[in-house]
Amino acid sequence: MNFYEKESVSLYLQELEYIEEIDSGKQHISFLSHPSLGRVLIINGEIQHIEAYQALYHELLLHLPAAFLPRVEKVLILGGGSLFAAYEALKYSTIRTVVLCDYDRAVLDLMGRHYSHAKEVLCDKRFHYVESDGWEFVKQCSERFDLVINDCLSVRNFLL
């Protein structure tokens, strides 16, 4: 059986208005607004988050694998600077710890300025942030987790 791409797939957005733009020293972060898709997060020219698709993506990303576990207490999220995956994880009453490993704290801070869910996550005592490359963190981490979520757009390090 052969699989091939008949047509290239792309998303072209017009009518974007800048809300905030940051050069964090690690990456260029743009936070914009679209009239029908809501807020859009772009990092280094790549779309990372579109508000209109958030529930479809993050609820499945977290709740589907969690449904196969008898009890979820410790969660590791690789990437996830939008904090939506962490927000979904913290909905579980059994959660003791959510560790989010993301490359750039500036993304979390930006989300905290613009989303109430992000403010909640950042203030939750069960939430812990590690500023690191996800692959490097996983290689060095001896801690065990019940659930590991890959909320990274780039998988290049995992392919090496």
Model-identified regions with their sequence ranges:
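Short, isolated positions in well-ordered beta-strands
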Residues: 29, 48-49
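Short strand-turn-strand beta-turns centered on an Asx-Gly dipeptide
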Residues: 43-45
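The AdoMet/dcAdoMet-binding core of the Class I SAM-like
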Residues: 1-4, 24-26, 52-160
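N-terminal auxiliary segments of SAM/dcSAM-dependent transferases
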Residues: 1-40
